[in-house]
Amino acid sequence: MSMTTLVILRFAGIFAAYTGLTVLLPAIMFRRILVGRGLSEQFLMCYTFGNFYIINIVFAVQLLHISGLWALVLFTAVPGILIWSRVNRVSLRELCIKTGIICKKILQGSMGMRGALYRVCNRIKAVLKRSVRLFYYKVICNTLQWILVGAVIIALFWIYGRNLLLTYGYCASDIPVHLNWINEMVRGNLFSDGVYPFGFHCMIYYLHTVFRVDTYAILCVFYLVQVFFIHMVLLAVMKLLCRSLYLPYAGVLVYILGNLWAKQTYSRFGASLP
């Protein structure tokens, strides 16, 4: 496998993991609250909560000195399930009883595997139908806006993404310092050299511990994940503030493509820094 392919696959995996934690997980937890809101508002609500959720989970398990794979998974899953059931008004007790009855019927032979699979397939079909309907109303009915979103993403990857393939390294001299902080968190030392580990360190530590990706490898590619979401948040905020449908896209494109400010304004976008 070539280095370029490895870097692309590594970036795709980290991007998917981070997106799942900060966008998809909150979207599932707060589905009932999010229904009826605009896509920009939904994204900002999910992304803000998702980051704070993961960051505070890391702080909690680190301060309790129980940090590790299973502690992080449990502290993520259990509160997430409880919040999901409370927000979406789903009774966990009734859900467990129904699941237990189905399992009992399968074990007793009163319900065959074909019947169980039929129920599962019907549930999957219902989810797919809702997904197709949502895709139609959110994407197909707003084709021009999604074309502009694609233009923003292409510009973003053209300006910042090429560096991912051309430079195999940290791209900033102080990243080894942040690497040391995160490695100390792995050893259980949250504040090894003063009160410093902010959300960036907590998120990298979580990705390393739960998804088993080396910290140094995450730091080589995570900057592009950061840059992507920084500009998506900027776009979402502008869409909520502007009356014009297309001015936000023009503004973000000018910010990405225009060399309007000092070099230091853009230099931090080229490295995985807090």
Give the positions of each predicted feature.
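Detector for Asparagine
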Residues: 51, 56, 88, 122, ...
